[in-house]
Amino acid sequence: MISRYSRRPVSHNLEIRGLSRSCLDQHPLPEEADNGTAHSSRLLHNLQEDMSLYSRSEESSASSVRSGCQTLTTDDTVPSWSGIHSYTGTGISTERSSVFSWGYDEFDKAASRQVQQMFEEIDELLYERKCETQLKGLQDECQEWAFRFPHLRILGTQVVCPTDEGFQWYATPAQTPSPSSSFQSKENTVSELYVQGRRAVLCRPTVEVTNPSIRTSGNNEDELPSVIEAEGLIEEYLAYDCRDMDEECEREYVSRRRRRRRCLPPVSPYRCRQEAVLDMLFDDVWRELIGWIEELVRKHWDGYVLDDEKSTVALSPKCPDPQNPFMLPSNVSTVLPPLSQTRTQQLTTNLQAQTSRVPVGPAVAHHNLNDLIMIHGIPLQQRNLGTLDRLNQSDCRDSEDKVSHRPGSSVIPAGKPRPRRALDQSTSSLTRPPQSARRRNPPPRNLMPITSSVTQPITTMEEVVRGTRLTTPSDRLTSPPMHLSRNTLLPPIGTGDIDHVYSGQHTRLIQKQRGSSSRAHSAVTDEGISLQPRDKLHLLDVFSRPNTTHTFRSDTPYHRSFTGIDNIGQGRPGRASVGVDSLGIGVTGISLGISSSSFIDSFSHRPMGHFPIGHEEEPDAKASGQARSHNRGGSTARSSRPGL
């Protein structure tokens, strides 16, 4: 197979693949064949060379199988570069892909084969005792290495196969020559793994040991010293840990101190005695130390303090312990003697004179408080208790007058009555004492006489309302509510005429109802003439047609409630009592919202069963018929007057 090839001209100004022209001059490229016969003969020669190399590698692998002794080498021992057997090949490296670079590949591979062969010969000389090398100097050098470094001569069979790429097994001869005769005499087989070393020189025994005549008669033959022969090198290692005892003691002391800080102090008797002894010793040493440095402190003080400052900053402490002269001046408390009037005047004059001479600087810190603080006794003033009581009583009376003259501010509830609230619950808000009376707790005192300044004009109830109190089902079934005011006095039993005397002293009560058209205002003023028509209208609304729709329902909201005037505060003129007439005395008001049949039936249970206004029954019916308004429920009675 002949291939034609035409050479391309290459510029000599360029470098070929990083190689300079000097390299090309030293290693010229091979000449191209003129004809095809020369080229074919070269290909045939390369093929024959490859076949010979392959046959040699087969023989070496067969011998390695027979011997069983394997060693490591690389694949480069078999030059498998038959792929590059012509100048048309591209080579192994991708960098040398030019058609002219095949010569450089040949040179590199030839050099690498030579170096690899030299390394293999060195390994065989050192480890396998082979002498097949042709280099005399290399053989002598390897013998010298083997003599100086015996640990390199380790013979044996490799058990673990190599895992690295590029390595293979090859056979070694069964009998390997050894350089020394002593080694050959003891060597039986090379398949065993052992380490060769130098023989130890044994010491000869002394004359007393070898001569049996010198031995004592009582000794046996077993007591003779014997030397055990052994081969190998003996090395002795002496390890000594040098620790300083002082450092160790110091470490223990520091660790003890740390442990003592972390935990509670010891409370054992031994520790307590130890601490007490240490405290006493410290006190003695401290006293001696203070006594030694006392003179130095005084000299230092005298040297730095001026004469002016000595008079001002004079230390005059009184020592509580005269037998102990080693107390520091700063620890001794100064005692101030009692001062008289003459001494006080002298001190004030001296202080005024010395204020201009007080130094400003570090010496001011040494000032003491002697002659600067004056303490005098002040006689106690006895208080007049009778005068204070009178003042308190007068203040209380004034506050009561203010409360009584106020137009019903403490009696009227703040908000509107809630729906679905019973009649007793709606009127119970009037029985609560005012906030000011609940907060303060006045001491018990006697009743004050009625004076002209406290009296008020008395207005009888005949001018306002004439009638009899009507009972309700709640009055018959339930007990009267308890009064929340503490100091209200109960009225005497059987007094019916006294009710009209103090009735004009109470405040006016105004109860606002929900809705603008269903309001009921009941007020008591000194002008009874202006309120008579309004009261007559209230009385007329009571005898209207009964409401039978919500008569027996307990949850019916009461749109109107009592507007009552309490009449209990008989023992205290000038003090308005808060509450409803729960004792059944006098007239407190008339219900505007209850018009049921049960309420009308309650009139028969009164002992005085006459109606106060009998001639106004017919106009009442007419007025109630005109005043009734029809809403959704059809059961709410509203007043036709816009002002109510």
Curated annotation (Swiss-Prot):
Residues 449-459, 626-644 have a biased composition (Polar residues). One of its GO terms (biological process) is cilium assembly. Pfam families: DUF3719. Residues 392-490, 551-575, 609-644 are annotated as: Disordered. It comes from the Eukaryota. Signal peptide: none annotated. Residues 395-404 have a biased composition (Basic and acidic residues). Belongs to the FAM149 family. This is Protein FAM149B1.
